Regions:
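Polybasic low-complexity intrinsically disordered regions
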Residues: 88, 97-286
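Charged, often Cys/His-bearing segments associated with DNA-binding zinc-finger transcription factors
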Residues: 1-37, 142, 179-183
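Basic, low-complexity intrinsically disordered segments
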Residues: 2-5, 20, 32-140, 155
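N-proximal short alpha-helices
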Residues: 3, 7, 56, 84, ...
Length: 286
């Protein structure tokens, strides 16, 4: 017998958010590790809000902020506005963050403002280090064998915001301007973005020139876990400089170890290989 296409919503429900999350879902194991790390950050969170202890409107709980930010990374949600939109209807996201089905979702601007407090107090770095400490306690890290890589991060700024440094006007005016920049000589020495002054006009390989930053990661090869990360301005030396800095950090943690480093051909430069400490062992990738 053919079923009918009807929809009847119950006035009451006895379902819990946990009932909608499969027992084998990877976020279950991740959430346990996340909550253990957040518990160890309680003293930091208390210091962050000492100036607001006398009263005022309650902020977003820092634990919920960090869980939401982690979801944004894991699921590649490109903006806070889209993240809040997904939290509104995604029961998995609500469960992971710690919001009930009845809880209101935060306004994106409020979320961004509260997130800034985390950044100012290095809470994100402390959270990363707490998770890394769990991996170390479980002997998931070799502390000797690493790989390094970098990637381009596009800035939230348009080409029209990239104007001469001595040109007046803010980012909105610059982006709204109708001037055609094509064919004009532009460089980071003479120009900057009025929307994001820290970004740099940069191209790599066959890619087009864009306003960008560079992200860098150091991975422990035993289980493929990221043990260090940096974001820098984009230039031709940033990848190698960041790699040397992260390898130096690894040496300080384990000074007696013989550290090996894997990298692609972009790091095969005479200013990098000798500085890394040993002669290279090259192997062609198939």
């Amino acid at each position: 017998m053919r079923g009918s296409d009807t929809f009847t919503e119950s006035l009451f429900s006895i379902k819990k958010l946990d009932d909608f999350v499969p027992a084998s879902h990877p976020l279950r194991a991740i959430r346990v590790m996340v909550n253990d790390a957040l518990t160890n950050l309680e003293d930091l969170f208390a210091r962050m809000y000492e100036d607001a202890a006398k009263g005022g409107r309650p902020s977003i709980a820092p634990q919920k902020l960090l869980r939401a930010m982690l979801l944004q990374v894991l699921y590649s949600v490109r903006s806070e506005r889209l993240l809040m939109e997904q939290v509104q209807y995604n029961l998995l996201f609500r469960w992971f963050i710690g919001l009930s089905m009845e809880d209101s979702v935060w306004v994106p601007t409020v979320f961004s403002k509260n997130r800034q407090r985390l950044i100012e107090h290095d809470a994100v770095v402390a959270f990363f280090n707490e998770v890394l400490a769990q991996a170390e306690n479980k002997d998931w890290l070799s502390k000797e064998q690493f790989s390094v890589d970098g990637t381009l991060i596009q800035a939230w700024a348009s080409h029209k915001s990239f104007v001469r440094k001595d040109e007046p006007g803010d980012g909105e005016d610059a982006q709204a301007g109708g001037e055609d920049f094509r064919g004009q000589p532009r460089s980071n020495d003479t120009h900057e973005s009025k929307s994001d002054p820290d970004s740099r006009l940069y191209r790599k390989g066959k890619t087009a020139s864009e306003l960008r930053f560079m992200g860098h990661t150091l991975m422990d090869n035993r289980n493929g876990l990221i043990v260090n990360a940096k974001v820098t301005q984009a230039d031709g030396h940033a990848e190698r400089d960041a790699a040397l800095s992260m390898v130096s950090d690894a040496r300080q943690i384990n000074p007696e170890a013989t550290i090996t480093l894997g990298a692609d051909k972009g790091y095969d430069a005479k200013e990098f290989v000798p500085s890394a400490g040993r002669s290279p062992s090259a192997q062609s990738a198939r």
